[in-house]
Design a protein with these regions (language model features):
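Hydrophobic alpha-helical signal/anchor motif
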Residues: 1-3, 24
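N-terminal periplasmic "start-of-domain" segments of outer-membrane beta-barrel proteins
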Residues: 10, 15-46
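Topogenic membrane-insertion module of multi-pass membrane proteins
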Residues: 48-88, 272, 287
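Select subsegments of transmembrane alpha-helices in polytopic membrane proteins
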Residues: 50-57, 109-116, 174-182, 234-238
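Multi-pass membrane catalytic core of lipid/isoprenoid biosynthesis enzymes
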Residues: 52-54, 96-158, 188
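C-terminal membrane-associated helical module and adjoining short loops/tails
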Residues: 170-287
Length: 287
């Protein structure tokens, strides 16, 4: 990363001085690629736009890790949900204000890896999977494996998402979004603790869900993205009513509603895919 002084004329567009040296204004940052020798100039405004919600989500993910290590699993689960809410706001605000930048995309992806890749895996491991050692040496390693499958799935999902920006159908996600996968694991922890269930009793379900969420994230199963709802223009009354109803249901019993809701969303992809395949196979040849 290179930060330079303004040129003599103060022109932001001028990159070379009279001696042919590359110069960067103080309010801009240059990212230099050692492999290609290319230089990408990023304005401070782009960094500020990306920092707000993404940094908040990153902090929430970090808080989830720290509180889980202290044994405060409900707080850790809530922190993951807060990270998800901030991440959703970040993307929505960027699309509404047309302030999406390359720096913002990369920074958001790194924050997502912490909040929805590492944090949920560590929370579910600390809460339930580490107790699998009581079942024997092999089972303890399977607990490690389940947590790693989830983490690797999140990393691959985020990398694939970055490479498909601009070419993928915005109506659908390819693979389960990492915030939704994280919400399923966080919901399991919060729901179980709220109902007096110990992690040592939930190790089997916890390991299965962790591995399943990791696999769904890297699958080709399509999930509806809800990006067609444009809040910049007129929003249908039914859409607003649905949002209000969702908030009402969540306030009734947050851990139960959030866990069941995100679990249904995670299962909706495979179910819809199987239904479509069945309909396709049942069609007569030539149609």
């Amino acid at each position: 990363v290179v930060v330079g002084d303004p040129d003599r004329q103060g022109h932001r567009h001028q990159r070379l001085d009279s001696s042919g040296q590359f110069r960067i204004p103080v309010n801009e940052v240059a990212v230099v690629s050692g492999a290609s020798g290319g230089v990408a100039v990023i304005d401070d405004a782009e960094i500020e736009d990306a920092e707000a919600e993404a940094t908040g989500a990153l902090f929430a993910g970090f808080a989830a890790v720290v509180t889980a290590m202290d044994g405060n699993f409900v707080t850790a689960a809530i922190a993951i949900y807060i990270a998800g809410a901030l991440d959703g706001m970040d993307g929505r605000v960027a699309r509404m204000t047309s302030t999406e930048s390359e720096f913002g995309k990369q920074y958001d992806s790194l924050a997502d890896m912490v909040s929805f890749g590492l944090a949920p895996a560590l929370v579910i491991f600390q809460w339930a999977l580490r107790s699998m050692i009581e079942q024997g040496w092999i089972w303890s390693k399977l607990g490690w494996l389940a947590a790693f499958v989830y983490t690797a799935g999140a990393a691959l999902r985020l990398a694939r998402f970055n490479t498909q920006i601009g070419i993928a159908d915005k109506r659908y996600f390819q693979g389960l979004p990492s915030p939704s996968a994280a919400a399923v694991l966080a919901g399991l922890v919060w729901f179980s603790v709220d109902h007096g269930l110990e992690g040592s009793e939930m190790w089997l379900l916890g390991s299965l869900l962790a591995a399943a969420m990791g696999i769904l994230m890297v699958s080709n199963v399509r999930y509806y993205s809800f990006k067609e709802i444009d809040f910049k223009n007129r929003v249908p009354f039914m859409a607003l009513l649905l949002v209000v109803l969702i908030y009402v249901f969540v306030t009734i019993d947050p851990p139960k509603v959030l866990f069941i809701g995100f679990l249904i969303y995670a299962l909706s992809g495979p179910v819809i895919t199987l239904v479509r395949l069945r309909k396709k196979r049942s069609r007569p040849a030539g149609e």
